[in-house]
Amino acid sequence: MKILESSFKDGNKRIVEMESEDAYLMTMGKWVKKSMDPLRTKVFFSTMSPTHYKIEDWGGEQGKNFYNQTTPIQDMNHWPSDCSKTLMKVIGEELDQRADFLVTVLNITQLTSYRKDAHTSIYKKPWSPYDEGSASKSG
């Protein structure tokens, strides 16, 4: 990623190349330091929810949907196929190492991966009543 560290109007344009993750962490750090009092506030970093595209990740049949799921995943080692444990670990480690302030990571990715019974496509207001055939296959 190329970042312009000067004004467009400045004759001496300074362009820096860096990884997008580094740019994100740098920008977040600057904002937190400028906008928050670490003695009065806490910083939380929330990961993303899994995509929920593969019912097979929750023990369901391929091609089916989340309709009528009533129990969460009980296996604490469960991890969806489209989520990376390594990436979640790296996020926490990177934030710990790079930030000049305490950052608490809310691992929504892992937390929501257990909840096949709470898939939002089942609980939204439908145009017509849900049944096994009409519930969204992809969520």
From Swiss-Prot:
One of its GO terms (molecular function) is O-acetyltransferase activity. It holds the Pfam family PC-Esterase. It comes from the Eukaryota. Coiled coil: none annotated. Belongs to the PC-esterase family. TBL subfamily. This is Putative truncated protein trichome birefringence-like 46. It comes from Arabidopsis thaliana.
